[in-house]
Each structure stands twice: as structure tokens, then as C-alpha cells.
């Protein structure tokens, strides 16, 4: 642990979520002082406390009620912090009776307010945002580029999902999510090019995050990762959608994702957009792994033809010295183990019968 880490104050928005709760645990283990924001529910409070308990951390985390649909509520949590992790994502727009016309509009407005609050704090050195790699589709945009159908040769940080391009299994609901994440990330990155930025902004478009959780239930993305084994058709349909959108299935273990966030915090200086995914397999690579691991199970398989999985042009985080601990197989295997522990998968059915394993 850095001897000065206890003097560093960090704000984590969305501290009750999948990534937020795990990040809080990691920060406490390193001795940082953490402010966590959450919505005003008892369930969120219990989730936010789960990370420190499971991680063995004894520190008490100050919890601040805040809502992205009322971004001014984040000011008390940001006050006095040197680093701010933007992990929270707006949702439930219709139910919230929001003044905004869309989730994307709400997300951009929230980003602007939070950036202003960070400036007014006079203490914030860096804002680090958990973006989504779904905003970086390498689909070719015929209108903009004059090229044909299909994918670019590589996926890179210069890619932005062309929302005018159709693809197999496209979802109007997911389009809203992509648009909100895309617009808010672009708004954040534009801050670096301002006249006199008061701090640095980093965005990490994450792959499908899986592997483990400190929550008491399996997060949605982990459910997607194990869907070929669980045979949950809706979750598996999402995997197929990602394959169509991205040309591959970018994966990252939650522990690696949080280590990457910490890496970006602890560097002397860093700004810009950096992908965070340890592997870019195809959906067939994933189902083949599960079929090999569990030969006695009827693993769901995609019927769509897939060419070569689109790979990243460069590993920008890797060039800075970051290394992933978990590859594709470790991510998938630990996801299955976690889902079984939490009851989302029947652990008894996962055991390979002797008659099969001895062949």
C-alpha cells in the first residue's frame, strides 16, 4: 500500500452497483478514503456495504445519496476528493418522471454539472469514467466513409458506434443505452480540449464485465457471460447482439477492470480514451470453451456465421504498462463458479459425470 494513500480521498459514483461496489472494496484494501454515492434505497445501502465486508476492509465508507437525474446532489460527495470515478449510469427515466426528454439528454446534462462541481471543488485532479465498448463499434458507416458493409479491420479508440447502421438483433432499448453512454463519454472527453481544464479526464470503455462480484446476486453482465451454460435465451440473445455490433465479444474480469481504473488513478498523468478488455473472442470461441468444459451439457450455440473476430488495433493501456491477470478461459470459468455460488447455475449439474470424464 502506498504510504500516502490514506491521505487521498476518492469519490465513487454508483457505489452500490456491480463495478462500483467492487471498486470500493479495492480502494479500501489499498488504504484510500472513499466517498460512495448511491440512490435513496435501503437495498442500495446494503449493496454498498457488501464490498468492504467481503473484502475484509474495516473502514466505514461515507454514503451519499445522489441521483444522476439531479446531478447537483453529487456535490457533497465530490467535495474534498482528488479523484472521481463516474460509475453510475442513469436508468428508469420514465419511472423517475424526469424533466429530460431522453436518457442521453439526462446523461449529458449530468456530466456537465458534475464536471462543474469538480472544478468548483478546487481539489479534483482527475475524473475517470467507466464507459462501454458498445459505443465503439467497428461497423463500417457507408454514408460517412463511402465503404462497403461489414467491419473495419480493427476496433480502436477512434471508433464510435454509427447509430445509422443496422445490424442483426439490433434492439431499440439497447440503442438508448448506447446513445446515452456515447454522448456522455464524448462530453467528458471534450473537457480535455477545453481552454484551461482544471483536471484530466479519462474514459475506459469496458468490455463485457464478468468473473466475480461482491454483491449477493449475479449481475446482468455476468448472467450474459454464462448464458450458454444457463441456457437463458434472453441473455444469450444479448451475447449474439454484441457479436453483431462489435464483431467480437470483448471480455474483462471485474477485478482487472477495477485494477485498470486504479492504474489510471495512480499514474502521475493520463487523459483520453483507453479500451479495457483482456480478450476479444468470437461468440463461437465462448461456446466452444463451454462445450469442452462441460461436455455433458447442452450448451447454447449461435447459428450465425462469424468470420474472424475483430481484434483491437493496439492495446493502449498495455503500452502504458497495464497487464491483465485473467484471459478468456479464466473469465468464463470464474463466471460459472460465481454464478453457481450465487445460485444462478445449478452447481450439481456442472459436475462432469465419471462416464463422460473417463472417455
Curated annotation (Swiss-Prot):
Signal peptide: none annotated. Keywords: NADP, Oxidoreductase, Plant defense. It is an enzyme of class 1 (oxidoreductase). Transmembrane segments: none annotated. InterPro entries: Epimerase_deHydtase, NAD(P)-bd_dom_sf, NAD(P)_dehydrat-like. NADP(+) binds at residues 39, 67-68, 87-89, 177, 181, 206-209, 221. Pfam families: Epimerase. The active site is at 181 (proton donor). SUPFAM superfamilies: NAD(P)-binding Rossmann-fold domains. GO terms for molecular function: aldo-keto reductase (NADPH) activity; oxidoreductase activity. One of its GO terms (biological process) is toxin catabolic process. It comes from the Eukaryota. Its EC number is 1.3.1.-. Plants susceptible (e.g. cv. Pr, cv. K41, cv. K44 and cv. K61) to the fungus Cochliobolus carbonum race 1 contain a transposon insertion (Drone) in Hm1 and a deletion in Hm2 due to a loss of resistance. However, the compatible cultivar Missouri 21A (cv. MO21A) possesses other defects in Hm1 and Hm2 alleles coming from different mutational events. Belongs to the NAD(P)-dependent epimerase/dehydratase family. In tandem with Hm1, NADPH-dependent HC toxin reductase (HCTR), which inactivates HC toxin, a cyclic tetrapeptide produced by the fungus Cochliobolus carbonum to permit infection and acting as an inhibitor of host histone deacetylases (HDACs), thus conferring resistance against C.carbonum race 1 in resistant cultivars (e.g. cv. B73 and cv. Wisconsin 22). Catalyzes the production of 8-hydroxy derivative of HC-toxin via the reduction of the 8-keto group of 2-amino-9,10-epoxy-8-oxo-decanoic acid, an amino acid of the HC-toxin. This is NADPH HC-toxin reductase 2. It comes from Zea mays (Maize). The gene is Hm2.
